Amino acid sequence: IGRFANRIADASFTIDRKTFHLEANDGNNTNHGGFSGFHNKVWQWEELPDGIRFSLYSPDGEGGFPGNIRVITDYRFNEDNELSVRHYAETACATYINMTNHAYFNLCGKGKKITEHRLHIPADRILDTTPAFIPTGKRMNVKNTPFDFTSLKPIGTDLYADHEQLLWNKGYNHCYILKDEISVEMLEAASLYEPVTGRNMTVMTDLPAVLLYTAGYYERPDTAGC
């Protein structure tokens, strides 16, 4: 997903006092890079000893974004059952890029519900959003709210709670703040446990936040993933 995952308000931004107008594909906003987003491109690929590499070239002005940019995404799998996803980008001018992947996980198998998955996210704040999913700039403390996963909790416990943020998003679609600074340190972003199968998963990242999405806008959201 790119050039920029999630929404950019009013499909525009300013760099060095110059405003760039983007493709508005989500009402008045840009979502996932617009109609020209990386998810609509045919990538080049090559096999790696332990995975696969995808590469793409995006020219200056594509989707309204400035700068020629080359991106690489590596998927690697090792003998410790660790899947790593690494994004690389190179450009020669000031621009914005915020890549992600859209992998979803259901630890009890296809067609099963995720509501009994136990989730832990070591974050005490989320980004507050508008009904159009645009961050307001405020940070909301999760304590005593449905968004508190600081202790292991079934996803379904508060999934349908009467909270405006959940109602707008048809469930969880929120950015959890893991740290306040940018660093290369890998931290645990989330851990997931499915009690029937005993399967578990830990997510690590060097980025300052993780987004929890329970696929409320999918056809069968309760059988999707997180």
Question: Model segments located where?
Answer:
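An exposed, glycine/acidic-rich loop-and-rim segment of catalytic or binding clefts
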Residues: 1-226
